[in-house]
Amino acid sequence: MNRLIRYIGVGKYIQEEFALDKAGEEAILLGRKAFVLGGKTALEVVRDKLEASLAEKGISCEFATFTGFCSPEKIDAYTELFLESGADFVIGVGGGRAIDTAKGITYRTNACIMCIPTSVAQCACYANVIILYRDNGDPLPYAWNLIQPVNVILVDTDIIVRKCPVRMLSTGIADS
């Protein structure tokens, strides 16, 4: 019996020092207006460089701060903000919960996505599933499988090395 094994992988993976400087040239292939979703700290770390890189290519952006857990209800709420913003693609920034929620927007809308991790203690950028929780943080007994892959992952090693908390760095190394 022949079995077809289907794997959805990432379209493009870039890992280098100052990779964030390339965000604009990668994003221009995805759209003209970005909806950027990330945690408070992650957005503080990347916002200025990301905004400048996007602006160089004429890409506007709207930022939204992620809080809480990646739940179906939270995904629906951020999807509404994405649709209201008029953006045509998503940029997820930060750790696993924020990235999974950004992927959830694309799951709902079929929009393109770029992921920018700020911690190595997660694999959400590359994983083709969205791990879901209840709003109180309890895990749901199921996950959503992505219909389309993440388009671009930008891993800026300068951010990972200099800005990532040591506990997250050691957790990520141990997890690998």
For each feature predicted by the language model, list its residue ranges.
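Short C-terminal domain-edge/linker segments immediately following a structured domain
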Residues: T65-C70, V93-G95, Q122, A143-P149
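A short, small-residue-rich loop immediately preceding and capping a beta-strand
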Residues: F82-V120
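Glycine-/small-residue-rich active-site loops that bind phosphorylated ligands and cofactors
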Residues: A42, F69-S71, R97, V120, ...
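ATP/NTP phosphate-donor binding region
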Residues: M1-F89
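Short, glycine/charged-enriched secondary-structure capping and boundary segments
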Residues: K49-A52, Y78, I105-R108, N128-I131
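A glycine/threonine-rich phosphate-anchoring loop and its flanking beta-alpha core
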Residues: G11, Y107-S176
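Short glycine/serine/threonine-rich phosphate/pyrophosphate-binding segments
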Residues: L20-D21, A42-R47, R97-G104, Q122-Y126
